[in-house]
Amino acid sequence: GESVVICEQVGDPATSKGPVERAVSRIVTPGTLTDAALLDDKRDALLMALSGTRQQFGLAWLNLASGDFRVSEIAPEKLAATIERIRPAEIIVAEGLELPFAPELGSITITRQPDWHFDSEAAARELCAHFKTASLSGFGADGLRPAIAAAGALLRYAQATQTRALPHVQALNVERDGTFLGLDTATRRNLELTETLRGQPAPTLF
């Protein structure tokens, strides 16, 4: 659950009279880990963002290593099970967002960001600028305000931690509610799909 700041030397040792100047090249967090040697073979290091109200939640999640970027909107009662299915390493939420299901998140890192990072209109503009499109209709994301808000906050955070644009993130994929068979948290754990009842990585079904 820790973050690591990676710095690179930018100054010239030959001309520097004191310590050589260094600059932050990237910040590695649980959800932005891309080093193959450190990744779990059975689990992607996914970064997720949540935004929404008591009626509807918007989710966005990104595999920074592959560039796979997805969004969805679901009812609050399905949120915990959906997070269990996706299994992100880190979740970004607004400072003012309450998480009543927080005890169920286990070891997932929760990162708070300013509320204004989740403004849906600003998020739509940032996403359009990133994808170089006039709108998000080509991705089927029109009208998904909570999901767009989450996606914008996620993209901003990912770019900030990597200190660069993310050209390999080239599309926004919309997952509609009902696309997947929903299993509650208890059922998923009892089936030992991805970890045993004792929390071990093996033996499991996947």
Name each model feature, range by range.
Residues 1-206:
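Charged catalytic and DNA/RNA-contacting regions of genome-maintenance
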